[in-house]
From Swiss-Prot:
GO biological process: tRNA (guanine-N7)-methylation; tRNA modification
Organism: Eremothecium gossypii (strain ATCC 10895 / CBS 109.51 / FGSC 9923 / NRRL Y-1056)
Matching HAMAP family: TRM82
Pathway assigned to this chain's UniProt record: tRNA modification; N(7)-methylguanine-tRNA biosynthesis
UniProt KW Secreted keyword: no
Protein name: tRNA (guanine-N(7)-)-methyltransferase non-catalytic subunit TRM82
One GO CC term, this protein: tRNA (m7G46) methyltransferase complex
Gene: TRM82
Ranges where the record places region Disordered: 69-103
Basic and acidic residues composition bias: residue spans: 69-82
Predominant place of localization: nucleus
UniProt keyword list: Nucleus, Repeat, tRNA processing, WD repeat
Quaternary data: Forms a heterodimer with the catalytic subunit TRM8.
Length: 450
């Protein structure tokens, strides 16, 4: 069976659809006439992580050799001797370092492609890889047989988790799992030394956004510790304000283009928060718990050791993604590991989000993306139970409701099966499917506070 799509991204008019399957990015282009999709490009992350480990081992070997040499003393005859108590075992110079190999029972290592982001002019695509903790940059050149041209690969000290481009696309802002944010040039050669962070949190960063207020730019960052921080940019050492109100982790931030002074945020709490980030005010919160509760399963239960054992049902819901359209006052909210998507409408009069529609899907939703030009919502599904079909569902706003474009959905399914059914690198079994749901793992429990 073909592996489910882990991540989707589309350009503003929906003519390009990027799909991540295992460790490969596929770019599909529609001909614009009958909705037929053609494979326009692809890129596979074949980086050998063992080489990265070997390089780190070699670096450590050289450090220990230098440290050992510095600890040597000399006798009266000028001969070097080891200082007592420093007889550490160090590798001999010139000897190949021994690269550690996972032993029996070690968890599998996945070559994740963790996120995708288009530049504002849609001429560049950036992806984050787990294999070497890098951001990889592509030029989108549709006149070529393969439209994805890799031109830069920038490694980072820790795994990237979220990215966004500066307004002029000259810089990429990247948030990592260590709590640091980096700003690197989008063009030019990769920095040979580890880049220096421009700001940081004391917890894993989960999302990042760049906003503008009266010609001043700010970077908004969210973390696993329910914090949302607003910092000046590029003077990011200056903190403008904090937004307090969440009790659990924040997994997704969304600044709507139709009201750039607002910010939506959600994660492990039972609500979606609406902020006036410029004033630092919590405008309202939308409680989605009663809507999502009927769609939760035993997969949403906490680990057995954290159950109350009192017969209570403690299924925990999380929002994995928030999205908005360019000129439509709707918010798309994706509850993780469920078969529904919430469509919320912003009521400017009451200053609140109102449930407009609940989309019911045949399978769990994995990822979501929207087009800004024609109000399309594209969802990828966990189709392990229905291999070969239901890779995506495409919805369009018609008469105030989002309706499925069945022909468009089928066109994507047909293109994937046509191009990938004979490709062994994207084949899998049910037991070997990459983990598709990551957000709920951000929830902190007793073991994280000890």
């Amino acid at each position: 069976m073909i592996h489910p799509i882990q991540f989707t991204l589309t350009n503003h008019d929906g003519t390009l659809l990027f799909c991540v399957i295992k460790n490969t990015i596929f770019a599909y282009k529609t001909n614009g006439e009958d909705g037929h999709l053609d494979l326009a490009g692809e890129w596979v992350d074949d980086y050998d992580s063992a080489e990265l480990i070997k390089a780190k081992v070699e670096k450590e070997q050289q450090r220990r050799l230098a440290e050992n040499a510095a600890k040597k003393l000399k006798t009266n005859e000028g001969e070097a001797i080891e200082r007592p108590g420093n007889q550490r075992r160090v590798p001999l110079p010139g000897k190949d370092p021994k690269v550690p190999v996972p032993g029996p029972g070690a968890p599998p290592v996945y070559q994740y492609i963790r996120c995708l982001q288009l530049s504002h002019d849609e001429k560049m695509l950036v992806a984050c890889t787990d294999s070497d903790k890098a951001a990889v940059f592509f030029r989108i050149e549709l006149h070529k047989d393969n439209c994805l041209t890799l031109f830069k690969r920038q490694p980072f000290p820790k795994r990237p988790n979220a990215v966004t481009f500066a307004d002029d696309d000259a810089k990429l802002l990247l948030a990592d799992k260590f709590g640091d944010v980096y700003a690197v040039d989008s063009v030019g050669e990769p920095e040979k030394k580890d880049p220096e962070p421009i700001l940081g949190h004391v917890s894993m960063l989960t999302d990042i956004a760049l906003v503008t207020d009266t010609k001043k730019s700010y970077v908004i960052t969210a973390d696993r510790d329910e914090h949302i921080k607003i910092s000046h940019y590029p003077q990011s050492f200056v903190i403008d304000k904090w937004l307090f109100g969440h009790k659990e982790f924040v997994s997704s931030l969304c600044v709507p283009e139709w009201q750039s002074s607002m910010l939506f945020s959600a994660g492990g709490d039972s609500f979606i928060a609406t902020w006036d980030w410029q004033k630092g005010l919590l405008m309202s919160s939308f409680d989605y718990s009663t809507i999502v509760e009927p769609h939760l399963t035993d997969a949403h239960l906490p680990p057995a050791r954290f159950l109350a054992n009192d017969g209570s049902d403690r299924r925990e819901a999380s929002i994995s993604k928030l999205l908005t359209f360019k000129d439509l006052p709707y918010l798309v909210a994706v509850p993780e590991m469920t078969k529904i998507v919430l469509l919320l409408q912003w009521d400017a009069t009451s200053g609140e989000l109102i449930l407009s529609q609940t989309l019911a899907l045949p399978l769990n939703v994995v990822s979501a993306t929207v087009t800004s030009a024609n109000h399309k919502l594209i969802l990828s599904l966990d189709n392990r139970e229905q291999p070969g079909k239901n890779f995506v569902k495409i919805f369009t706003l018609e008469n105030g409701k989002f309706e499925e474009e069945q022909a468009a959905s089928s066109s994507v399914d047909e293109a994937i099966v046509r191009n990938l059914s004979e490709r062994p690198e994207v084949q899998t079994t049910v037991d070997d499917i990459y983990p598709l749901y990551h957000v709920s793992q951000l929830r902190k429990r007793g073991e994280h506070y000890s």
